[in-house]
Amino acid sequence: MNKFISKQSVAIWYALTALLATFIVGQVILWFFPDGSSMGTSLLFILMNLIPLIVAAVFSLVLREIKSLGAFFKKVFLQKESPLSWILAFFIPVIYYGISILLMNVRFTGNSLLAFFLYFPWTFLYGGLEEVGWRWFLQDHLSFSKHFIPKMMVLSIVWFLWHIPIYQLPWITAGSSNYLIFYLMILGNTFLFGALKEYSKGAVPCILAHMLIDSLAVLMLVQSSLLQIILLVSCEILISSWIVAIRKS
């Protein structure tokens, strides 16, 4: 990185660029493909989900943090991860859905396990790859505080704002119409994925955890009960903070 450019300024410009680019693509979809049924819609929607990764690659190259696009993908996808990071990648969905089940805030869809396996590959494009931007790039550049909780609070706000243009598309049903509940769910997952990133070098464990959470929604949906969501998020924050504290100790 250029020694005259701080990590904090990079984080700010990265967030603004990713948010603006996503908003613009979302508006193009609404203007030219409002019914959401054409090939153009699908391609642009994939592009929206890839913007965090694309902007991270561009920033990494421009700032000379990596020498080539090949080096970027190697650093993101081909790192040798610790066994603990893989364990956490599978444990995070257990935390999210397990606590929700204990709080009786889950509706089982009745779909078969086959539906999970069929949907799982799609979540690589529709969710998983955004982790390259948020966790691998932005979390690393949020250097305003050494403390985990303030960094996650800031990251959760950026991640929440990024989702808004996506969930304004008329055919998207994944987002809650209640923006408070929507933000709280984003907040909890920010802490879980953020804790996982503290243990991983690249982005693959975070991508896997994200894909598992999204894919399991085919089988069970976390409901929008405010009290249960607050309890869920509180547990996620406490568990994530404990996981990070163990690593630092």
Identify the residue ranges that each predicted region occupies:
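Juxtamembrane helix-entry segments on the extracytoplasmic side of multipass membrane proteins
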Residues: 108-120, 171-184
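Alpha-helical transmembrane segments and their helix-entry boundary regions
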Residues: 10-14, 85-86, 137, 151-152, ...
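Membrane-interface helix/loop boundary segments of multi-pass membrane proteins
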Residues: 21, 129-156, 198-202
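Residue-level hotspots within the lipid-embedded alpha helices of multi-pass solute transporters
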Residues: 94, 123-128, 160, 182-187
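Specific transmembrane helices
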Residues: 2-127, 198, 221-249
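Small-polar-interrupted transmembrane alpha-helices in polytopic inner-membrane proteins
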Residues: 97, 151-164
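Active-site His/Glu-centered metal-binding helix of metallohydrolases
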Residues: 128-133, 137, 161, 165, ...
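Functionally important transmembrane alpha-helices
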Residues: 177-235
